[in-house]
């Protein structure tokens, strides 16, 4: 178009009133014929809005006079614009065209932080996927081009992944994400609806082709498919091929995939619609699939789409704007039948070497999965052989029963051969005889494949060096570079030197009949033996190894490498790894050692040395070999448990070690196998030991083991063997050895995962531990019979069948069906327990209720005592009674947990203070009683004070109306679970007391097993991917994370669990024992199994540590008031739960509507709000709130709603599990039915139709029935009552003894106390509280803890009390104390002064004042940081820096 036309258009446009304020000019037009578009180039001083562009287009169309697409591109007049101005003012314009082409990049380009560094623009974003996409598509170049074209500026652009932005604003965005999903799926549903309408028959060209990807879009009218069948879960039957998930991107359109579902998430919108997200993998990658479920599909889809489903999915691949990655919006889901790997052989093998997730940080498959797979394969048995432990046995036992298969219980132990002397083949040689100390250098590690290149030797006689031997050897092969690097021996140095055939006879002549000595003799002597064998000769000389000699003589050395031993003894070793120098150094070590043994140990000859060494051998320093131990029968199980226990308790050093002599001692009932390449036999074959030596080693084993070649492929990489053929030769050698010795040889997999695909999980776990070869995973999967036959076909058909099938079956047939854990229960026994419990109960009950017991008491007592004694539970009660009595005797109250408070016998035997009888009065004088049996009173504590009408004495008020059935079941035959809260500072004393009760060796801490948690696994996965530069979908990260969870990391102990073995039994009939976390420095011994697996067989006592008894003990010490005498219905105390007025402060002053700060159970923000909502007026109300706050779906979305809407009140809502049974019985439901309904509801199982019908028949209101149906878990009333009793007693001290209350609270509970801040007063506290409250959901756990302390400190100041500053001489180490002017914080209340430092200062100040900061630091051994903290607080005011006096002070 002509320039005149352009000018005319410019004049017309500029006359428009809407545009005349803008400075712009059309510079040219471009006609794009292909798209029928007129591109208009505009130069402008200002940004153009969409409305302004629209007006310009109208003018152009009018001037042209025909219809055409008009595209406006404008650039800014940039005579002096900077890069920063481009980003700040014109960034939207820069990105406009890119976003048109790639809409998904809007989030990255417009909402990401941008940093300018010189000429470089850095765009940071939290989506690794999108950043990778941007860089792959070279979007950075496009941005750079636009900036150059429009602004004339040269720049660099980088789009950078920033992990810190990955979860930013996640919570705020989640709701929007769900709305976006809903919107997207509604569109999909509309499309489906349109597709389902009848359509005209289309031509074959228009029919929809389900080819896995349809990038050209999805034609609604062409969607025509097969009708639904029984495998159709959603939508229609899917025809056509699938594509790999890894090939899907945001441009894939409609795709069809198939795979395994490994996780599902269900989200319900506010409108009640269900969004199902499930994660699916085809093992090329994984992807999230989302679908918005219509009511008609909901039940069917949710019932079928679960973890483990194998299915086919068709839907649209689309970018999820919030997950920031591609997901599939599902239209169709079909169930598929997965073709699994099966063992189709007629005769099946048996796997005898299998690891589970209990092989710590090494294997990735649970025992249950392994046993299930073996059963699916049709195998008659499968062995479980974890590294050093047997912790998978309980799960394996359950799985064996479920799958009807025999499990062979075993372990892959760590053998320490404590039967190998220092001198092999030695007799009575004196230390003054001849010894030849030698060393060799070689081309590699294999005596079979590598060559000797140097021999150096020194001869000793009478303890002195008398001769030497030294020569290079021409290996006739090239010396590897790494050997030259190590030894400095080059090819030129050995070329032309004598060969080994020439050298070896001369060397052996030099040796004569001497004792051969070498450091790590197996290596050097192995090469000599191999070369002598090639010459048809054998080595007969005695051989001494200075490695075990050094371990024996110099036990302080952690490592005994030659250079380290030499350094320790002050012996020169200048050219380490040269044969001559190493031999001389070893000779000097031997000289020194001979002298030491003669002079200090009275050892003068080889025989005495061997005897003393073997009798005092330190197993913890011996080299280890793998060994398989299988239990043949029940005796074998017990002996195996003894071996595992000894390995962990007596011989643990980095690994649980098993001395060979101990295995021999406990060998009865066991089958011993030679294990893998780390076994003693395989190592010996690899080292080239003689046939005689191999037979001696093999004689210890019942069977020999060989494994697939690829299992040991790493030996080729390490240079130990030449190639795969040599690996086969090693297996052949073991097979031939077995045949010669008549020992079965078996082929095993050494399984560490189930299927080939699973190796990725082990790869990640090993990489996370720093293994450099983690990516070179051998195929340690569970092979079928045919797969194993193929692996060993090189042995020949007959031998192959023998090792794979016949011999594995033979070993399996040797094993009986055994029980690693017995089925029965074995309670401890105390002679006369039944009579003792009956007597103490009757004595106590008569002392309270009189000789003629009220009917309600007698009836309850008879029922409970009969159930307890007839079912054998008296001993459990007696144990609990003795523990509580011990604590009370020592001055510490005990709180009961759980439902033990529902047992009246527990109350009368002083196990619990909670009285489960109906509310009542009883006279302490004449024993008259009045019971309230109509349900009008929930707790006796709320009865008004009253005097006995018969004698005038003040009535005792008691009873909380808790049915006995909650604790022992309706028939009274449910095993009681007595949990007790002892003072945390007294807990260890009670634990020790259990040993007094039952005897040492019958009491063990309950063991736990710590596994890789999801968060840790996620960290392993992310680290693995980042280190390798791999970018995968979040769904794939999720899959990898799931695969890495549940793997054992460590062992531990339950905080209060004690397992008790009857004194006529022993622990090895149940499980092995060990130290927690294998800590050899503790005297604590735990069960080897997780306590859950044996808690049904042995008694578990829960002796827990708790703050409340500690608090009450300290309060009693400070005030002299016995907490047991405190009334439970003091009006002022009860008022605290609705108002702070009783504290002398208003809610406006305090900033809180209640006065429950710091009270156990009632001080949290959540419960404080419950108090505001419910306005409790009684002890019973507080019990209900305790129940409501501890249940799941009992308050929120349940009682809270029904109270708010007026259906019920706090008094009548369902709060604890016992409420249901009591209420239904008052409604005239049969007791058994009431109990059954209570049990179902408390476990979250809801109500049956029959239950609902019966309840309605008895006039139970609808809201009550609905409330029952919503409950997931309920708290027992006995537990709630016990908690509230403690809380009310502590609240009493808060009201009436404020100094004691705050002193105690901060001493016992305030771990995060910051004395520096809090001592500044209430204004400083208020300011910090406001700062922390402003953080909202971003507040950290530590900050939450500080906020709680600040709230209580602020309350204290408002009550007129104050804190004194920490004082170096007046403050205690760890306890707050009351002084005349206020409460003095301890030294450890300063952030930066730990408990140990504080205690050290207090101990040292007893010996006099500190004369300087230096004196304080040196005497108390505290750090400079502690000194600075004390100084900053003012504790060291006036104290000089050092001990030196200044002359010029």
From Swiss-Prot:
The keyword Transport does not apply. SUPFAM superfamilies: Ribonuclease H-like. Residues 194-231 are annotated as: Disordered. Residues 197-208, 217-229 have a biased composition (Basic and acidic residues). Residues 435-590 form the Exonuclease domain. Transmembrane segments: none annotated. Its EC number is 2.7.7.7. Keywords: Cytoplasm, DNA replication, DNA-directed DNA polymerase, Exonuclease, Hydrolase, Nuclease, Nucleotidyltransferase, Transferase. Belongs to the DNA polymerase type-C family. PolC subfamily. This is DNA polymerase III PolC-type. It comes from Clostridium perfringens (strain 13 / Type A). The gene is polC.
């Amino acid at each position: 178009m002509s320039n005149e036309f352009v000018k005319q258009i410019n004049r017309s446009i500029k006359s428009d009133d809407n545009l005349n304020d803008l400075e712009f000019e059309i510079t040219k037009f471009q006609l794009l014929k292909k798209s029928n578009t007129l591109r208009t180039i505009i130069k402008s001083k200002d940004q153009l809005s969409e409305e302004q562009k629209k007006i310009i287009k109208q003018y152009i169309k009018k001037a042209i006079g025909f219809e055409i697409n008009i595209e406006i591109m404008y650039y800014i007049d940039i005579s002096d614009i900077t890069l920063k101005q481009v980003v700040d003012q014109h960034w939207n314009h820069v990105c406009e065209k890119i976003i048109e082409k790639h809409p998904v990049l809007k989030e990255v380009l417009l909402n990401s932080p941008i940093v300018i560094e010189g000429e470089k623009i850095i765009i940071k974003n939290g989506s690794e996927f999108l950043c990778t996409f941007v860089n792959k598509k070279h979007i950075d170049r496009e941005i750079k081009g636009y900036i150059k074209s429009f602004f004339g500026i040269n720049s660099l652009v980088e789009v950078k992944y920033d992990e810190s932005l990955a979860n930013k604003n996640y919570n705020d965005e989640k709701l929007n994400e769900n709305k976006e999903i809903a919107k997207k799926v509604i569109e999909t549903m509309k499309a489906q609806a349109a597709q389902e309408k009848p359509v005209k028959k289309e031509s074959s060209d228009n029919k929809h082709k389900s080819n896995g990807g349809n990038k050209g879009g999805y034609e609604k009218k062409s969607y025509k498919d097969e009708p639904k069948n029984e495998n159709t879960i959603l939508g229609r039957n899917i025809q056509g091929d699938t594509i790999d998930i890894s090939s899907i991107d945001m441009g894939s359109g409609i795709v069809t995939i198939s795979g395994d579902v490994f996780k599902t998430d269900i989200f319900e919108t506010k409108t009640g619609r269900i969004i199902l997200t499930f994660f699916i993998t085809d093992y090329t990658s994984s992807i999230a699939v989302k679908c918005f479920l219509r009511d008609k599909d909901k039940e069917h889809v949710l019932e079928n789409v679960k973890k483990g489903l194998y299915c086919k999915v068709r839907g649209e691949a689309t970018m999820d704007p919030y997950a920031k990655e591609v997901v599939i919006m599902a239209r169709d889901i079909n169930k598929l039948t997965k073709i699994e790997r099966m063992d189709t052989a007629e005769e099946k093998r048996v796997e005898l070497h299998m690891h589970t997730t209990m092989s710590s940080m090494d294997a990735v498959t649970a025992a249950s999965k392994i046993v299930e797979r073996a059963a699916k394969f049709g195998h008659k048995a499968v062995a479980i052989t974890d590294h050093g432990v047997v912790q998978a046995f309980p799960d394996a036992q359950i799985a064996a029963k479920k799958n009807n298969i025999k499990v062979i219980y075993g372990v892959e132990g760590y053998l320490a051969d404590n039967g190998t002397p220092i001198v092999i083949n030695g007799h009575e040689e004196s230390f003054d005889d001849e010894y030849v100390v030698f060393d060799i250098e070689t081309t590699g590690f294999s005596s079979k494949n590598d060559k000797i290149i140097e021999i150096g030797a020194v001869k000793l006689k009478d303890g002195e060096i008398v001769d030497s031997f030294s020569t290079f050897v021409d290996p006739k092969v090239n010396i590897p570079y790494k050997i030259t690097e190590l030894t400095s021996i080059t090819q030129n140095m050995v070329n032309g030197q004598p060969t080994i055939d020439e050298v070896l006879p001369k060397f052996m002549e030099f040796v004569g009949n001497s004792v051969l000595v070498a450091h790590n003799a197996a290596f050097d002597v192995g090469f000599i033996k191999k070369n002598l064998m090639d010459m048809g000769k054998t080595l007969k000389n005695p051989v001494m190894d200075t490695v075990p000699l050094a371990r024996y003589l110099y036990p302080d050395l952690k490592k005994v490498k030659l250079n380290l031993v030499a350094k320790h003894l002050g012996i020169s070793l200048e050219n380490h790894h040269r044969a001559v120098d190493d031999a001389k150094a070893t000779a000097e070590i031997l000289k020194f050692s001979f002298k030491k043994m003669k002079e200090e140990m009275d050892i003068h000859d080889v025989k005495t040395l061997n005897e003393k060494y073997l009798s005092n051998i330190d197993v913890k320093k011996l080299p280890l070999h793998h060994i398989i131990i299988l239990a043949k029968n029940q005796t074998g199980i017990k002996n195996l448990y003894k071996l595992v226990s000894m390995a962990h308790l007596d011989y643990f050093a980095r690994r649980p070690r098993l001395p060979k002599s101990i295995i021999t001692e406990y060998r009865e009932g066991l089958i011993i196998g030679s294990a893998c390449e780390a076994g003693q036999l395989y190592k010996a074959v690899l080292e080239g030991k003689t046939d005689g030596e191999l037979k001696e080693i093999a004689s210890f084993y019942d069977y020999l083991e060989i494994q697939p070649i690829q299992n040991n492929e790493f030996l080729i990489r390490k240079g130990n063997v030449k190639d795969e053929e040599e690996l086969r030769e090693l297996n052949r050698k073991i097979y031939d050895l077995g045949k010669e010795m008549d020992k079965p040889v078996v082929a095993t997999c050494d399984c560490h995962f189930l299927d080939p695909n699973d190796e990725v999980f082990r790869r990640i776990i090993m990489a996370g531990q720093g293994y450099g070869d983690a990516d070179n995973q051998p195929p340690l999967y569970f092979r079928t019979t045919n797969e194993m036959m193929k692996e060993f076909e090189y042995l020949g058909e007959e031998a192959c069948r023998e090792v794979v099938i016949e011999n594995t079956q033979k070993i399996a047939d040797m094993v009986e069906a055994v029980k690693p854990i017995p089925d029965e229960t074995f309670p401890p026994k105390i002679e006369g327990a039944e009579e003792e419990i009956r007597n103490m109960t009757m004595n106590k009950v008569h002392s309270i209720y009189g000789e003629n017991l009220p009917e309600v008491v007698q009836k309850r007592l008879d029922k409970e005592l009969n159930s307890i004694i007839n079912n054998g539970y008296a001993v459990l009660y007696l144990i609990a009674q003795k523990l509580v009595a011990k604590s009370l005797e020592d001055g510490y109250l005990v709180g009961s947990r759980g439902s033990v408070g529902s047992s009246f016998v527990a109350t009368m035997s002083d196990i619990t203070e909670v009285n489960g009888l109906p509310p009542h009065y009883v006279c302490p004088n004449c024993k008259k009683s009045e019971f309230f049996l109509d349900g009008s009173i929930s707790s006796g504590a709320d009865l008004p004070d009253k005097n006995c009408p018969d004698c005038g004495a003040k009535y005792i008020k008691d009873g909380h109306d808790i049915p006995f059935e909650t604790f022992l079941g309706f028939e009274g035959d449910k095993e009681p679970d007595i949990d007790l809260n002892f003072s945390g500072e007294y807990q260890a004393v009670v634990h020790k007391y259990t040993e007094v009760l039952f005897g040492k060796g019958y009491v063990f801490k309950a063991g736990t097993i710590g596994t890789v948690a999801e968060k840790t696994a996620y960290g392993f996965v992310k680290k693995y991917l980042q280190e390798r530069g791999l970018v995968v979908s979040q769904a794939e990260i999720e899959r990898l994370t799931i695969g890495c969870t549940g793997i054992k990391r460590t062992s531990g102990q339950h905080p209060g669990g004690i397992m008790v073995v009857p004194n006529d039994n022993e622990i090895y009939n149940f499980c092995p024992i060990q130290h927690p976390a294998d800590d050899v420095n503790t005297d604590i011994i735990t069960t080897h199994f997780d306590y859950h697996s044996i808690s049904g067989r042995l008694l578990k006592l829960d002796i827990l540590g708790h703050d409340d008894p500690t608090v009450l003990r300290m309060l009693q010490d400070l005030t002299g008031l016995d907490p047991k005498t405190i009334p439970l219905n003091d009006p002022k105390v009860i008022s605290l739960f609705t108002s702070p007025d009783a504290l002398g402060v208003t809610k406006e002053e305090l900033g809180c509507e209640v006065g429950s700060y710091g009270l156990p159970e009632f001080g949290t923000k959540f419960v404080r709000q419950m108090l505001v909502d419910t306005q409790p007026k009684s002890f019973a109300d507080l019990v209900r709130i305790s129940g409501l706050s501890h249940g799941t779906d009992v308050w929120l979305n349940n009682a809270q709603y029904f109270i708010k809407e007026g259906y019920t009140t706090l008094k009548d809502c369902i709060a604890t599990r016992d409420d249901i049974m009591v209420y239904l019985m008052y409604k005239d439901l049969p007791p058994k039915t009431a109990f059954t309904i209570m049990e179902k509801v408390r476990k979250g199982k809801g109500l049956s139709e029959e239950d609902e019908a019966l309840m309605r028949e008895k006039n139970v209101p609808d809201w009550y029935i609905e409330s029952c149906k919503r409950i997931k878990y309920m708290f027992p009333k006995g537990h709630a009552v016990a908690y509230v009793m403690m809380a009310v007693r502590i609240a009493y001290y808060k009201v009436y003894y404020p100094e004691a209350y705050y002193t105690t609270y901060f001493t016992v509970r305030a771990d995060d106390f910051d004395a520096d801040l809090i001592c500044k007063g209430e204004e400083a506290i208020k300011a910090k509280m406001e700062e922390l409250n402003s953080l909202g959901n971003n507040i950290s756990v530590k900050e939450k803890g500080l906020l709680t302390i600040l709230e209580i400190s602020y309350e204290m100041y408002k009550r007129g009390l104050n804190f004194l500053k920490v004082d170096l001489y007046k403050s205690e180490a760890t306890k707050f104390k009351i002084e005349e002017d206020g409460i003095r914080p301890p030294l450890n209340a300063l952030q930066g002064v730990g408990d140990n430092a504080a205690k050290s200062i207090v101990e040292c100040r007893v010996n006099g004042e500190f004369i300087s900061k230096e004196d304080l630091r040196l005497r108390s051994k505290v750090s400079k940081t502690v000194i600075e903290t004390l100084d900053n607080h003012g504790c060291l005011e006036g104290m000089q820096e050092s001990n030196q006096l200044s002359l010029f002070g």
